Amino acid sequence: MKNAYYIGLMSGTSMDGVDAVLVDFSGAQPQLIASHTEAIPSHLLKGLQRLCSPSTDEINRLGRLDRNVGELFALAVNNLLTKCAIAKEEVIAIGSHGQTVRHMPNLEVGFTLQIGDPNTIATETGIDVIADFRRKDIALGGQGAPLVPAFHQQTFAEVGKKRIILNIGGIANITYLPGNSDQVLGFDTGPGNTLVDAWIQQVKSEPFDRDGAWAASGKTDQDLLTQLLSHPYFSLAYPKSTGRELFNQAWLEQQLSPFNHLDEEDIQSTLLDLTCHSIARDMIKLSNEGELYVCGGGAFNGQLMQRLAALLPGYTLNTTSALGVDPKWAEGIAFAWLAMRNHLGLPANLPAVTGASREAVLGGRFSAK
């Protein structure tokens, strides 16, 4: 059977690098051929972080960063192909998520904005690019997120098995696969790694809390946890999605101001519990028991996994590697899949998940010619 190669590009709210994956979709299940992470240079990272907070001269900065991120994504593709020695002519298309700089679907005129110019990626790689996956769903009245549940359904659903796929990046999202004819559901539960990363970066200048070791050295403050969990987002009904617009460093500092007597490691422990409790609450609303499979950066945080297991005694807990998909690359593979769906003219959103009025083919194609 002829190979069906697609490349997926993903940079999430954590902004911890650009993940590039080469995937073969010619078989029954996606096959990961090669993977590569391109580090985000510090000057570009600072520019992106500034752009995520409203300020002046935004349009000029947006235009520059759009090109810069496109160049970085193209570099990730070219390095990926060098690594696996596959010619660009063999790749059908690149699916690029881009870098989200605003996600505000709940305004009167909702919108989402990802940058990373697909024209730049196409011209610098010589491969057609499919990008701008979220805005069609928003145009149809949806949240534009999460988009991965359709991929999870096709890849992980099994009749008779009640499964939840939990993706923990900067933001955490879940996909509920009921194992029967009931609707697949999915939504963002709230912060994933974004607040624990922000706190350790602020206090220790470390990029992330490796294996949750710093959180494990602290003790959760129940009063602070209760206050954090009182954020209105946690009581919203789905479909719902969120991002740095709600859960960011400024919000965190505001929440911490009455708690400046707490030790720094106790705050870290509490922030990790915020992630775990908000996930567990939403999961228990869907079902008290089932199979839980975790992907994304959070899957490699032993302390996070341990706390989740304690909060969810009715669930068996594993990573998506048990289902044949490496948890580190799952989201990149999903965007390669979204590119394939666009190329084949097939819908890729789930209206029950996003709230869109109908299914739709997502993304636009940007030719390399």
From Swiss-Prot:
Pfam families, per this entry? AnmK
Q: In which pathway does it act?
A: Amino-sugar metabolism; 1,6-anhydro-N-acetylmuramate degradation; Cell wall biogenesis; peptidoglycan recycling
Output the SUPFAM superfamilies linked to this UniProt entry: Actin-like ATPase domain
Keyword annotations for this protein? ATP-binding, Carbohydrate metabolism, Kinase, Nucleotide-binding, Transferase
- EC nos: 2.7.1.170
Any Gene Ontology biological process:
amino sugar metabolic process
GO molecular function of the protein, one example? phosphotransferase activity, alcohol group as acceptor
| Catalysis: reaction(s) | 1,6-anhydro-N-acetyl-beta-muramate + ATP + H2O = N-acetyl-D-muramate 6-phosphate + ADP + H(+)
| Residues given in the record as ATP binding sites | G12, T13, S14, M15, D16, G17, V18, D19
User: What InterPro entries does the record point to?
Assistant: Anhydro_N_Ac-Mur_kinase, ATPase_NBD
Class of enzymatic activity (EC top level) = transferase
- The protein's superkingdom reads Bacteria
Q: What's this chain's function?
A: Catalyzes the specific phosphorylation of 1,6-anhydro-N-acetylmuramic acid (anhMurNAc) with the simultaneous cleavage of the 1,6-anhydro ring, generating MurNAc-6-P. Is required for the utilization of anhMurNAc either imported from the medium or derived from its own cell wall murein, and thus plays a role in cell wall recycling.
Q: Which family does the record claim for this protein?
A: Belongs to the anhydro-N-acetylmuramic acid kinase family.
What protein does this entry describe? Anhydro-N-acetylmuramic acid kinase
Query: What is the organism of origin for this protein?
Result: Shewanella baltica (strain OS223)
What would be the name of the gene that encodes this protein?
anmK
